[in-house]
UniProtKB/Swiss-Prot annotation:
EC number: 4.2.1.44
Protein name: Inosose dehydratase
Assigned protein family: Belongs to the IolE/MocC family.
Pfam families the record matches: AP_endonuc_2
Keyword Cell division listed: no
Source taxon at top rank: Bacteria
Listed NCBIfam families: myo_inos_iolE
Swiss-Prot/TrEMBL keywords: Cobalt, Lyase, Manganese
GO terms classed as biological process: inositol catabolic process
GO molecular function: manganese ion binding; myo-inosose-2 dehydratase activity
């Protein structure tokens, strides 16, 4: 890949999990960002332990050569929380803008079961009605316009347990929104949802022109099989090791890197692989991911 086009980041979720704060609660902010830099990454997404005052956060990252590239934002358009979502988005956007980020990764969380004690591989996830889809599309088009006014871009993070998880749901969303709304492509969630590498790559191929942010996440199929067999929740699966870093699971990332490179992708690739840090030392796994990417992507 072209190192002038692609930058590498890593998310703090491998060190401490915002959905399960007990995982990695002992890992401090300064330890997290220091280990990111030591492992060879130049970017980070934002976690709950990060100071939210840019005047405090930026110098602490600058000294380590780390730049903020994105931060998760939850939207609730389908269930009618338009005004509240937009107000909170503006504050979130202004923070990211102050930090120099260009991308705002969003997830439509109306009815999401990702944090609930419900089987993640079943029929418990939300399925939006036509009216709800319209609310989502109109909401995201508004966010896209607001972001563009700041020189930024909004992208939708397809995610397990949400109303925009499957290939069909991604297709529906992308057909309804305008050109100012992009897709955050997540290898792990695509593989997990669709059950393999071929459908994962099909999503990537189809939406290359609309992808502005990439999450690199590997999966462990034996754990996914257990999640399916035992009716486990998303978070139970995470604790058992559903996800891991690139090079440690089943996904061959070389076709992913080739597709992005051939298209001329410009932006961040983010190692975003949540697992229990007590079982998978975050620094060791960050180093493992960085080595794998260097060997397979050439950057």
């Amino acid at each position: 890949m072209n190192k002038d086009n692609v930058k590498l980041a890593i998310a703090p979720i491998g060190w401490t999990n915002d959905d399960m704060p007990e995982l990695g609660s002992e890992n401090t902010f300064q330890q997290i960002v220091s280990e990111m830099a030591l492992a060879g990454f130049t970017g980070s997404e934002v976690g709950s332990k990060y100071p939210r005052d840019p005047a405090v956060l930026k110098p602490m990252l600058d000294i380590r050569g780390i730049q903020i590239c994105n931060a998760w934002f939850s939207t609730f358009f389908a269930n009618g929380q338009r005004e509240k979502t937009i107000d909170e988005f503006v504050n979130h956007m202004n923070f990211l803008h102050a930090m120099g980020a260009k991308v705002i990764g969003c997830s439509e969380q109306s009815g999401s079961i990702q944090g609930l004690d419900k089987p993640i591989l079943g029929d418990a996830k939300p399925c939006f009605s036509d009216e709800e889809w319209q609310r989502v599309a109109e909401g995201y088009n508004t966010l896209g316009r607001l972001a563009a006014e700041k020189g930024m871009q909004v992208c939708l993070h397809h995610h397990m347990g949400t109303g925009i998880q499957t290939t069909a749901e991604i297709d529906k969303f992308m057909s309804l929104v305008d050109e100012r709304v992009f897709l955050l492509f997540d290898t792990g969630h695509a593989w997990y949802s669709e059950g393999g590498e071929a459908p994962m790559l099909a999503i990537l191929k189809k939406y290359l022109p609309r992808i502005n942010h990439v999450h690199l996440k590997d999966v462990r199929p034996p754990v996914i099989d257990q999640v399916r067999r035992d009716g486990l929740s998303f978070l139970d699966g995470v604790k058992k090791g559903t996800f891991t870093v690139p090079g440690d699971g089943v996904i061959d990332f070389r076709p992913v890197f080739k597709l992005l490179d051939d298209f001329g992708y410009k932006g961040w690739m983010v190692v975003e692989a949540e697992q229990d840090p007590a079982l998978a030392n975050p620094f060791e796994y960050a180093v493992k991911a960085r080595k794998y990417i260097r060997e397979t992507a050439g950057i």
